[in-house]
Amino acid sequence: MLTTHWLPAARLNVKQARKFSLLSTHASFPATMYRYQLERKATLYDVTQDETRHRKDAVNVSADGLVHAAISKSSPYSNGPVFMPNSRLMQQMLRFDFDRYQEEISDGKALLDPTVICIPRGTPIPSALVLWREGMSRFSLQPSSPMEIEKLNDALSEFYEKSGTVVGAQEWIEKHPYRESSPDDNEKGWMEV
């Protein structure tokens, strides 16, 4: 049985503590989780700098020039990449984003490398990052202490390379039919897969 490790409250950004609705904090992945992104490496960006990029890679950079761990009521909701188990909502979001990417290619946008990153259950989180559970089946990897966006991208890319498996989005969709996903409220179902 996997034990959830709770991180000390000191790792939270005290100035932003009232802005988020945090369900739990984890030192390891409590379930196998996935993330869709358009490139193999992390490409988070400052939401105020570029309106043309993939919105789910946007984060808020504070006035001090650093990314602070945060959950917001408006987009971007998480200040880090979102991971989800193979749930209905995850499948719907991934398929929608991949269909949208294919439409953009048809409209002449540049080819990218849409992938799904898989992080297995029990994988420890590096000290530079923290895993927050924000919703029923929604988790995000965020900086454990404020850092520059480039360093956050480097920490995430290194974590993906060392601890994750990267699969092409089309291949992942073909190997993971929607009918095999778990309802988001069936925590026992997706936690034990």
Description of each model-found segment:
Residues 2-193:
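NAD-dependent ADP-ribosyltransferases
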